Amino acid sequence: MSDLQKGMALLISTFHKYSGKEGDKCTLTKGELKDLLTKELGGAFGNCSDQATLDKIFKDLDTNADGVVDFQEYATMVACTTMLCNKSLSKK
């Protein structure tokens, strides 16, 4: 398996590690998203213990406004975060 394939598999397995604990196994609830952001991305999303911050992040990610974050919305978040990290690291 190539490095890129391993990265894709990790992206998928990380999503499913947190999804389905509170509801549908193919989506993330707000609580599941909070756990994922806190445990997997640390400070990259600021203070996720602040409810207003979490609500804003969730609203921005839930682009179809169905009350959950699906895999496509999650993958978009990871891709955008990766682009921001790349941009920051490229400046150094």
UniProtKB/Swiss-Prot annotation:
Identify the residues that the record assigns to the EF-hand domain, covering every copy. 12-47, 49-84
Q: Could you tell me which cysteines form disulfide bridges? A: none
Q: In which tissues is it expressed?
A: Abundant in epithelial cells of olfactory rosette, barbel, skin and gill but not brain or muscle.
Indicate which residues the UniProt annotation says bind Ca(2+) 1: T27, E32
Molecular function GO terms recorded: calcium ion binding; calcium-dependent protein binding; transition metal ion binding
UniProt keyword list: Calcium, Metal-binding, Repeat
Q: Is this entry keyworded Chaperone?
A: no
What PROSITE patterns does the entry give? EF_HAND_1, EF_HAND_2, S100_CABP
Role played: Plays an important role in catfish calcium homeostasis.
| PANTHER family tied to this protein | PROTEIN S100, S100 CALCIUM-BINDING PROTEIN
Listed name of the protein: Ictacalcin
Show the taxonomic lineage.
Eukaryota, Metazoa, Chordata, Craniata, Vertebrata
